[in-house]
Every structure is written in structure tokens, then in C-alpha cells.
């Protein structure tokens, strides 16, 4: 696929981003067009903070994560595109519902699982899922279940460690190595592990570059 450029040659992450849609069911998905990358992770893993930090908009993801939208797929795109007549954004970020919260009723968990699996299995424009893991806790059982779901759906995913400012700096190399070993034999896992701190800004450019490479946008 040829590399894309963004409208007016503005850098992908150098322009404003906006929330465009919350998707509670497959029938509400936007038409397939721009490539998509999605973010998944346990509740309170720092998904909203990371998305906000990546696009430089402190309140963007939080605005869409109000009660009632927490079980939706939330779509964000660069601003300045009408969405009509071929004037489409170059890509979309998709914030997936957080998982692993004990108070969620079974019906809600089942609905989330169906929505997410249907999305993963049937969305041809989805290029990669970034699975966020809290550095303080590592990969937990809930995460293993999601990784297995991604493997089953044959969707490429990459692990992103979050909140690295909350652990000792000397422990990060071992955590990276241990995490890489845990996913080494998983068929859909991308081998490189990313590490971030939204609070300190660490690792953000590496994630941006990973996204650019994934969707074929050079800058």
C-alpha cells in the first residue's frame, strides 16, 4: 500500500483530533474507509490518558467516556475532514471499552465480548490493536483472555506498558523482557513491546511512530 499523507500535509499528530462517534452495536459502525487502530485494556489502565497524550488534547477521550458510553467503541479522527465526497480522515483511533471491572453484571460483560469480537473479526480496516498493560501489575488473567480473543480473530496486536513512572526505573528492562517472553508464542502478537508514561510523556513518540508505520503515514 502506498504511503498516505494527511490533508494540507499537516503531521498526523500535529493537528486537532475530535470525537466523532460512540458505537454500542455493530450496526452503528461508520462505513469502512480510513484505516483504524484500536486501544484495549483493563479499566483504569490509562487508556484515556494515553489517547489524550498522543493527540495533545487533555480532555478528548474523557469527554466521550461519560456514563452511558463506557460500553461503546469510541471513534476519534483528525479534525478538518468533512467525511463526504472522498474528504476522509487518514485514519481513526478507536477506544475500546475497558474490561476487568468486578462490578460489571454478566449480561454487560457478554454484550461487551460480543461487540468487541464481532468488531475484531469483521472489521477489514482495523490494522492493529494496542493492548495496554499496567506496568505495576503486568499481564493478568483478564488480559490473557483478551489476547486469546485477538489471536482467535487473527488481529495483529502490540503490548503497550502504561504508568512506567509508577515503577522503579531499574525494573523496566526486566519487565519488558518478561512481557516479551509471555507473548512470544502468541500468533497475532507483534513482538516489540512499547512502554509509556502519559504523566511524564515518556514513550509517546514511539507509540506515535508505531501508529504511523502501521497505517502507512510517514509523518
UniProtKB/Swiss-Prot annotation:
InterPro entries the UniProt entry points to: G_ENGB_dom (IPR030393), GTP-bd (IPR006073), GTP-bd_ribosome_bio_YsxC (IPR019987), P-loop_NTPase (IPR027417)
Binding residues annotated for Mg(2+), in chain numbering: 48, 70
Domain EngB-type G: 33-217
Transmembrane domains' residue ranges: none
Source species, domain of life: Bacteria
Keyword Cell division: yes
Single annotated GO MF: GTP binding
One GO cellular component, as annotated: cytosol
Pfam families linked: MMR_HSR1
Cofactor(s) recorded in Swiss-Prot or TrEMBL: Mg(2+)
Keywords: Cell cycle, Cell division, GTP-binding, Magnesium, Metal-binding, Nucleotide-binding, Septation
GO biological process: division septum assembly
Binding locations of GTP: 41-48, 68-72, 95-98, 162-165, 196-198
Record family assignment: Belongs to the TRAFAC class TrmE-Era-EngA-EngB-Septin-like GTPase superfamily. EngB GTPase family.
NCBIfam families xrefs: GTPase_YsxC
Function, in words: Necessary for normal cell division and for the maintenance of normal septation.
Record's protein name: Probable GTP-binding protein EngB
Encoding gene, per UniProt annotation: engB
